[in-house]
Amino acid sequence: MLDFVPNHSAYDSPWMSINKDYYIRERPDVEHNSTFFFENGVAFGGKMWTDVAQLNYFNPETRQLMQEQMLKIASLSDGMRCDVAFMVSNSFFELSWKNELQYYNYTTPLTDFWEVSIAEVKRQYPNTIFLAEVYGSYVIDMITQGFDYVYDRDLLTHLTNGNVDEVRAYLYSTAEYEQYMARFLENHDENRAASFFKNRTTITNAAALIAYTVPGMRFLFQDFQFGYKFKLEVHLRRSYDEPKDQEAVKFYEKYLPIFTSDVFKYGEFEMVEIKGDDAFTFLAWKWKYEMEKRVVVVNFDENQRECFVVIKDAGEGKEEVEMQEMLSGVKITRKSKEVQEEGLFVIVRGYSGMIFTYN
């Protein structure tokens, strides 16, 4: 997957001399505003990036030019991550550049750029995967305009807040489009995951147990498995030297093969019932794919807690169900009816979890 930056070009791009109308331009009837515009009248990218030039997505020629760039990328890669994808949608773009667009007589296109361009790329390269960097209310827009996956920054926010009810409510409220979500704890724009969780590896690992076992893309960043604390700066292409966090390394040695298995990719996902006085600190769900079954239980709380996890398909047609906790390797046998009705009793350390395989 390659990075496609649609919103702007370099200030010294050859496009600038070919056709300035590719770009948003300052109105000549107002005093020059150096906060948002270069001396030649071309706008900074997004009014914030002062070293790049803002492309005009209400100009059909610009749209055609950028669609050609997408086709070139699609010919070279399996997909593209589209930088600040929401910023070129009609609604956002008009809100950002309304005065300039009106002055130069640009009107709102009948369709969004992504809707047309993604369809054309997929016509020529059907297997191309599109990932949108998007936030807030524009998430649904990017899905409806054709993206295969969209950033899920909100899950990271809720996990950072540390409120289990908040995380649970979010997962239920987004269930309709959960398969489109790209789940991540860090990326090139964000700080390292540990910084969101008080630099405590146990909390970071517990967040990973949640983020990477719910439906959607598992969007992993370079060296995530080493538990580094210092951000890998894009412009420097390096970070401070630091030792690997051995607790994180040992955790991912066991966890990585688990959450990348087929059952978590292609299986059927379902939230499960949790019982007991401590149920409010737990999150739990199960997956089923062909003959494989998994149930994930996470205690996202400081203290050791206990609960009953109701697994209605445990030991179907059998008196007993055989289970193995995959992170520890511990095997147990329980009465099927007990697990189906009362629930599997578990005691889980603070900020920890269990992943069971069962028949």
Language model features: what each stretch is:
Residues M1-N359:
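Active-site and adjacent substrate-binding regions of carbohydrate-active enzymes
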